Amino acid sequence: MGNCCSDVASGAGATAGVGGSGSSAALGATNDALDYYLKSKGFNGLFSQIELSFSASNLRDRDVLSKSDPMVVVYQKEKDATLSEVFRSEVVLNSLAPKWIKKFIVAYHFETVQTLVFRVYDVDTKFQNSREEMLKLDEQQFLGEATCALSEIITKSTRTSTLELKRKDGFAPQAQPHHGKLIIHAEESLASKISTEIVFRCSNLESKDLFSKSDPFLVVSKIVEHGTPIPVSKTEVRKNDLNPIWKPVFLSVQQVGSKDSPVIIECSDFNSNGKHSLIGKVQKSLSDLEKLHLAGQGINFSLPTGAGQNKVLKSQLFVDKFTETVHHTFLEYLASGFELNFMVAIDFTASNGNPRLPDSLHYIDPSGRLNAYQRAIMDVGEVLQFYDSDKRFPAWGFGARPIDAPVSHCFNLNGSSSYSEVDGIQGIMTSYTSALFNVSLAGPTLFGPVINAAAMIASASLAQGSRKYYVLLIITDGVITDLQETKDALVSASDLPLSILIVGVGGADFKEMEILDADKGERLESSSGRLASRDIVQFVALRDVQYGEISVVQALLAELPSQFLTYMRIRNMKPIPP
């Protein structure tokens, strides 16, 4: 399954570069800069508020005259592997099977691996009247610990995980059979399911550009106590428009706190250098915006002045649409049995450099330091593997000449002629390293064949009624030479349960690649004039994020849940309760 073979004709016919139109490229760069600007200010992808409940069974009895008095403590593993305490339950007296009442509220972010460590302690009787947060843990008796990713809990059909408790030294439960079990149950908050659709319109905006009208966009930010407002949503940029109407903005109540929590709506004139000019801003709650819609009234923007006052402007903001609906969430689909299936395609063209030389993008460092391709595979794969039950991933290479064969633009990374799957992320890494020594780097850079191979798998799965959504990661160092063929493949694939993540490595000019990312411009159009039914591409240049606060995996995966939900809604597919 998933086998793809040499495409000699494509290779011979695509040796020259194919350029996009200047306007499309400019539009792509424009919104790419906007996305980077927002992410630098804290804008993240879809998230859900999760409530974790705890109980335990068969805990070890460490008290002589009574049963243990257990308390559970939760830690979050940070990037540097240190543990930060984030929660303590109450103490349950005299119980080896406690059911704690206190809940742990955590924000689930799909694009990161949120590793949690749970430790259970027997609280000494002499501390019975002390507040839990004042207890010194080194003065309590340790009963056992367990570790898991938050995604492992919420992807189970029952949203309940039973974890074996073990000693801190890592001894297996079989060696110490009396540590007991910790049961964790997850519930998604109702606020995660309430979606507000808002259509904003403005009138009489000030022109900030010298020779043209402003290019306005809106950013909606929530207000946090003692902190900088955090962006939670944005509109597209409207070119040369002083009376713009934007596409709908979707907000969940939890994103802003509550319906009565104030939000700041800023209207700015876009500049490609990232220095956007503020046109004006307003501060209102969702309830206020609903009232404006019902009354058909606008509200005037204001601008802060140097004297600490606000200057009221003639420019106004209107709410043309305001509707609230309870919708199915990403987590509801996962709990009902939907899976995300990971696939990867790796660029083996000669522009990567000789793999045996240290300056090659494909160089395998004997010290174990990962190259850019290995980092992208690990970073994305480590997140997505939790959503795939069998963890068998199709893996391809393109742009190379296998031994005694012509140049192939889609060959199985494992060397097989009949199947493309490998076992786990480590299987991809091993096959990638092996392939480097079994193929000759060639060219040109063609995406069409690997996209079509992924689309064939997604199409077959859809025909079988499988509850699977596929995610293809393409890692490349160069500009594609089959731009129109790639557009055709993407437009066709937009009807399938498939998203495509593209990572650009090295120093190439990736402007043409940004054209493929439809959220940075108009929808893709095929050579026959057909438009893509939805956006399925997310592109990130590794150099743009590797030194910032936003990781490549966050930048890539932030939009994936939204793409998944868009597909489900277009096809009217609903999660069937477990």
Swiss-Prot record:
Overexpression of BON1 has no effects on pathogen resistance. Residues 26-163, 176-303 form the C2 domain. This is Protein BONZAI 1. GO terms for cellular component: plasma membrane; plasmodesma; plastid. Disruption phenotype: Dwarf, twisted leaves and enhanced disease resistance in cv. Columbia when grown at 22 degrees Celsius. No visible phenotype when grown at 28 degrees Celsius, or in cv. Landsberg erecta, cv. No-0, and cv. Wassilewskija at any temperature. Humidity and temperature sensitive lesion mimic phenotype, accelerated hypersensitive response (HR) and increased disease resistance. Bon1 and bon2 double mutants, as well as bon1 and bon3 double mutants are seedling-lethal when grown at 22 degrees Celsius. bon1, bon2 and bon3 triple mutant is seedling-lethal at any temperature. Negative regulator of cell death and defense responses. Negative regulator of several R genes, including SNC1. May have effects in promoting growth and development. May function in membrane trafficking and in fusion of vesicles with plasma membrane at low temperature. Exhibits calcium-dependent phospholipid binding properties. Induction: Down-regulated by high temperature. Up-regulated by pathogen, calcium, low humidity, avirulence gene product avrRpt2 and salicylic acid. Belongs to the copine family. Interacts (via VWA domain) with BAP1 and BAP2. Interacts with HSP70-1 and HSP70-2. Ca(2+) binds at D63, D69, D122, D124. Changing D209A: No effect. Loss of function. Loss of function, but no effect on targeting. Based on mass spectrometry analysis, the N-peptide must be modified and there might be additional modifications other than myristoylation. It comes from the Eukaryota. It is found in: Cell membrane. PANTHER family: C2 DOMAIN-CONTAINING PROTEIN, COPINE. A lipid is attached at G2 (N-myristoyl glycine). GO terms for molecular function: calcium-dependent phospholipid binding; metal ion binding. CDD domains: C2A_Copine, C2B_Copine, vWA_copine_like.
